[in-house]
């Protein structure tokens, strides 16, 4: 079916514009409650968590009212990282978990994503059923649900994160600068790392409802890079607004992205954890990452962009590790979804076990220069059948001479086409990416 609301990562958009409005959220809560209660037996509870956007409070109330109207009991978690909602949904044996967040976007956006009772994102068929239910008139259940606050939800998640580490693991003597993006990890991540013994300098931990991701977090790590060098810290760690992404900064202030972090975790597993059966990346994963894994004898496969597709391929192949260069990393041996804090702990475990600085470990793989440019598009476009664009793509590939890649990918969450060019020569890659982006922009205008 053609989807009206759900994208690749739930429902997302500008607050106040359809469907990101209180009246829609009321109806969405009711529709989701009806579908999930009709489909499953057992728990009658659905959990709701959110990041720190000011609009999250009104959407929480609207969803809560809709769910209660459908006869569903609601557990309110308050500010909670997206993976924390997934974890608590499992441990409470809830019917589902709902996250109110627009991830790394500005506060003017918000969105909704659902987790099933097993802590994984809802399959497409259930999202389709919710869309169908949204077309029906809202009817009040004979028995209304109830709502309650879940006590010490943050503390439960903190203990879970620490519990994923082997007995005796500690970070004593390590100075970490933690950038929480004024987001959902602000009161959780610093406690996890400090309780494991690290000296923690937290930054961007003062959310006011409108400053989430503003000049900070995993997509804007420049301030973190400066702070690590200024303080002479060992490492910097940056999360995005909802805590499912992570990137590192080494002691020299150099950024370490998701591909490099995945490589480090895989190298650790291969040598110290009984081997790494394989790693799932995406179409955007750097070719140098693939070559680095090949040197270690670790299989690699590419999924479509989006953590749900990474997780699907991991399940299909029976592999335990996957992720994206943006910092979405999934370690399925310890959790069910992308989790910034858990992934950071896995990297720290690798660093402490290997006994080397991050700056040195990451050099095991040599990234190829990669340039990505976002081109705005007013409406969805058929890139594959646009002759002008395809001629430009072919010409770019010819200029790379078989030593690089070209990828055009419409974003699943924003009205943009991502133009990516990868190759051996940085100057050439930048020039070709700009030329191709100009052609795409002209063709879509």
UniProtKB/Swiss-Prot annotation:
GO terms for biological process: carbohydrate metabolic process; peptidoglycan biosynthetic process; UDP-N-acetylglucosamine biosynthetic process. Activated by phosphorylation. It catalyses: alpha-D-glucosamine 1-phosphate = D-glucosamine 6-phosphate. InterPro entries: A-D-PHexomutase_a/b/a-I (IPR005844), A-D-PHexomutase_a/b/a-I/II/III (IPR016055), A-D-PHexomutase_a/b/a-II (IPR005845), A-D-PHexomutase_a/b/a-III (IPR005846), A-D-PHexomutase_C (IPR005843), A-D-PHexomutase_C_sf (IPR036900), Alpha-D-phosphohexomutase_SF (IPR005841), GlmM_bact (IPR006352). Keywords: Isomerase, Magnesium, Metal-binding, Phosphoprotein. Binds 1 Mg(2+) ion per subunit. GO terms for cellular component: cytosol. Its EC number is 5.4.2.10. The keyword Isomerase applies. The active site is at 103 (phosphoserine intermediate). PANTHER family: PHOSPHOGLUCOMUTASE (ALPHA-D-GLUCOSE-1,6-BISPHOSPHATE-DEPENDENT), PHOSPHOHEXOSE MUTASE. NCBIfam families: glmM (TIGR01455), PRK10887.1 (NF008139). Catalyzes the conversion of glucosamine-6-phosphate to glucosamine-1-phosphate. Belongs to the phosphohexose mutase family. This is Phosphoglucosamine mutase. It comes from Cellvibrio japonicus (strain Ueda107) (Pseudomonas fluorescens subsp. cellulosa).
């Amino acid at each position: 079916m053609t989807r009206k609301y759900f994208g690749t990562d739930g429902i997302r958009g500008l607050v106040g514009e359809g469907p990101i409005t209180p009246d829609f959220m009321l109806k969405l809560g009711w529709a989701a409650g009806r579908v999930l209660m009709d489909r499953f037996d057992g728990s009658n509870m659905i959990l709701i968590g959110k990041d720190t956007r000011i609009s999250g409070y009104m959407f929480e109330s609207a969803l809560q009212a809709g769910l209660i109207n459908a006869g569903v009991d609601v557990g309110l978690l308050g500010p909670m990282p997206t993976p924390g909602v997934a974890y608590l949904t499992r441990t409470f044996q809830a019917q589902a978990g709902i996250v109110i967040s627009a991830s790394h976007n500005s506060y003017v956006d918000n969105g909704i994503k659902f987790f099933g009772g097993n802590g994984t994102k809802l399959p497409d068929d259930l999202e389709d059923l919710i869309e169908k239910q949204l077309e029906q008139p809202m009817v009040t259940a004979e028995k209304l649900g109830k709502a309650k606050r879940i006590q010490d939800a943050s503390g439960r998640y903190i203990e879970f994160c620490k519990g994923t580490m082997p007995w005796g693991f500690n970070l004593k003597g390590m100075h970490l600068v933690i950038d929480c993006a004024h987001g959902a990890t602000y009161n959780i991540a610093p406690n996890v790392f400090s309780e494991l013994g690290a000296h923690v300098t937290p930054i961007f931990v003062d959310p006011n409802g409108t400053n989430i991701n503003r000049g900070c977090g995993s997509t804007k790590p420049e301030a973190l890079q400066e702070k690590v060098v200024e303080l002479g810290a060992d490492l910097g760690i940056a999360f995005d607004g909802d805590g499912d992404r992570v990137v590192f900064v080494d002691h020299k202030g150099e950024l370490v992205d998701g591909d490099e972090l995945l490589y480090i975790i895989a190298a650790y597993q291969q040598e110290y954890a009984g081997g790494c059966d394989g790693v799932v990346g995406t179409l955007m994963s750097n070719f140098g990452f693939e070559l680095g894994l090949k040197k270690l004898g670790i299989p690699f496969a590419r999924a479509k962009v989006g953590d749900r597709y990474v997780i699907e391929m991991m399940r299909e192949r029976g592999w335990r590790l996957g992720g994206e260069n943006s910092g979405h990393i999934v370690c399925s041996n310890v959790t069910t979804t992308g989790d910034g804090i858990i992934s950071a702990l896995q990297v720290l475990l690798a660093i402490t076990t290997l006994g080397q600085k991050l700056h040195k470990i990451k050099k095991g793989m040599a990234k190829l220069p990669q340039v990505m440019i976002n081109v705005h598009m007013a409406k969805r476009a058929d890139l594959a059948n646009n002759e002008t664009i395809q001629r430009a793509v072919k010409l770019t590939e010819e200029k790379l001479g078989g030593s690089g890649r070209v990828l055009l990918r419409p974003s699943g969450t924003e009205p943009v086409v991502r133009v990516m060019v990868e190759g051996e020569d940085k100057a050439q890659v930048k020039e070709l990416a700009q030329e191709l982006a100009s052609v795409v922009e002209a063709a879509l205008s």
